[in-house]
């Protein structure tokens, strides 16, 4: 491994890759604020808990089949958590991410789902002995912070251009996490991030078409981030200006100049992981508040959704413009229904809190009949997670109005809240309570946890499959 290089005699300002690397490589448990560590443990619990509850979904099986075809089965490999078979670390990162992403209830940082990328990767690496469990939390936080800094700065522009934040910024996050887990020195960490900037991408069209590519993008981000870090550890010569250079990440994907100081200056001050949100319902993160508002409206209507003549739902323009959100159907997959504002609102008004069963009822006559009466409207005065519903109802002279000015704090649960959420999902999907006992023990014990608890938890769903 190349020797550590100091920056004391550097003539030019540090690049963004170098500043990210300095931050990530020097992250330690005692330099991460206690609230950020607590939130990281909540993210761990949520990630594993949602993956357990995703065992009935088909996406892991597809990814596992592909992994075994590409990488083969390895007796001494990393566990494919949905089946108990073993393959390469890269293979486990891909297959297991499809399980973590199976219900679409993974955590969200802005509009990116870093947990479904980072946790499968770090789990596989630690299981294979390619990293210490004591470095698990700092590596996880490094991924959230580096990926989150880019997402916060640029996702409104890249999302509008049709690029999905999770693979675009998650590939860089995964490289940061792997580099920190391996304790790569700053110069090799910078190389890992530069490599990841070259390997990142991912489009949103699958949401518009209601197809499944997005289910596998998170695993590919982990796999590509792993490759980026492995190449760096092996001595790759990588572009220092990978992010802000003339043909770098920011100009290529965002079509703007990169403000290195503005992005790097927030590291260690404005912690991205503290803004991570969790999803109470199996719908897109941007549909969580519309569902909550619809539940409130349903209560006011006494469950009589058939009396609704028209619904106007005002949302942030990013929400309305996001691929697949403003869509009336037809629907042939849950990838389409969980994104559609109209479907989510209609099924909630008719049936209450949505379940996977509700989201897969593509021919529900009541829902399909209500959808044409629901109209999403862009309102720049509303935040990303806020909404206002106005419903015209038979027998009422004035519209029934529900308004929710919500931000990330509404969905930023502590571990107790996460535990209640994932156990509720387990009841819905038939997961043994002991599985959640195991992952709670693991999250609580970090940084001195036993990964055997995680493997034991997933052993319960392997038997079920």
Where do the language-model regions lie?
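Hydrophobic alpha-helical hairpins/lids featuring a short glycine-rich hinge
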Residues: 97-152
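Short, Lys/Arg-enriched N-terminal segments with co-localized hydrophobic residues
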Residues: 1-13
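Well-ordered alpha-helical segments within folded domains of soluble proteins
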Residues: 115-123, 170-177, 223-227, 287-291, ...
């Amino acid at each position: 491994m190349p020797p550590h290089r100091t920056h004391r005699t550097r003539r030019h300002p540090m690049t963004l890759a170098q500043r990210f690397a300095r931050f990530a490589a020097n992250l330690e448990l005692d330099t991460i604020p206690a609230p950020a560590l607590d939130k990281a443990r909540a993210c761990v619990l949520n990630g594993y808990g949602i993956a357990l509850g995703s065992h009935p979904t088909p996406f892991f099986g597809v990814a596992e089949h592909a992994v075994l075809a590409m990488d083969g089965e390895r007796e001494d490999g990393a566990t494919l958590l949905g089946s108990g078979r073993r393959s390469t670390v890269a293979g486990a990162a891909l297959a297991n991410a499809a399980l973590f992403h199976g219900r679409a209830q993974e955590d969200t940082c802005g509009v990116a789902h870093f947990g479904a990328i980072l946790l499968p990767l770090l789990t596989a690496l630690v299981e294979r002995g390619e990293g210490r469990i004591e470095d698990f939390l700092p590596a996880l936080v490094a991924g959230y912070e580096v990926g989150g800094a880019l997402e916060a700065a640029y996702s409104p522009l890249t999302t509008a251009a049709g690029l999905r934040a999770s693979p675009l910024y998650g590939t860089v996050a995964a490289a940061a996490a792997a580099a920190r887990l391996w304790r790569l020195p700053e110069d090799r960490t910078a190389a890992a991030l530069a490599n990841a900037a070259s390997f990142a991408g991912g489009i949103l069209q699958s949401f518009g078409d209601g197809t499944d590519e997005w289910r596998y993008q998170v695993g590919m981000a982990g796999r590509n981030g792993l490759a980026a870090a492995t190449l760096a550890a092996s001595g790759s010569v990588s572009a220092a200006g990978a992010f802000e250079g003339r043909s770098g990440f920011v100009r290529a994907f965002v079509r703007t100049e990169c403000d290195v100081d503005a992005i790097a200056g927030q590291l260690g001050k404005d912690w991205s992981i503290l803004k991570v949100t969790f999803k109470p319902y199996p719908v897109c993160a941007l549909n969580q508040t519309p569902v909550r508002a619809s539940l409130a409206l349903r209560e006011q209507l006494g469950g009589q959704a058939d009396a609704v003549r028209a619904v106007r739902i005002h949302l942030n323009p990013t929400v309305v413009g996001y691929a697949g959100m403003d869509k009336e159907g037809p629907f042939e997959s849950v990838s389409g229904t969980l994104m559609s504002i109209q479907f989510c609102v209609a099924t909630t008004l008719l049936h209450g809190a949505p379940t996977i069963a509700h989201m897969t009822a593509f021919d529900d006559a009541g829902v399909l009949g209500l959808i044409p009466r629901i109209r999403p409207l862009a309102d720049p005065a509303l935040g990303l997670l806020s909404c206002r519903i106005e419903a015209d109802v038979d027998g009422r002279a004035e519209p029934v109005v529900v308004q929710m000015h919500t931000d990330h704090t509404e969905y930023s649960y502590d571990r107790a809240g996460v535990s209640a959420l994932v156990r509720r999902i387990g009841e819905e999907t038939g997961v043994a309570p002991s599985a959640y006992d195991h992952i709670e023990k693991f999250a609580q014990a970090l940084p001195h946890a036993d990964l055997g608890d995680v493997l034991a938890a997933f052993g319960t769903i392997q038997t079920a499959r």
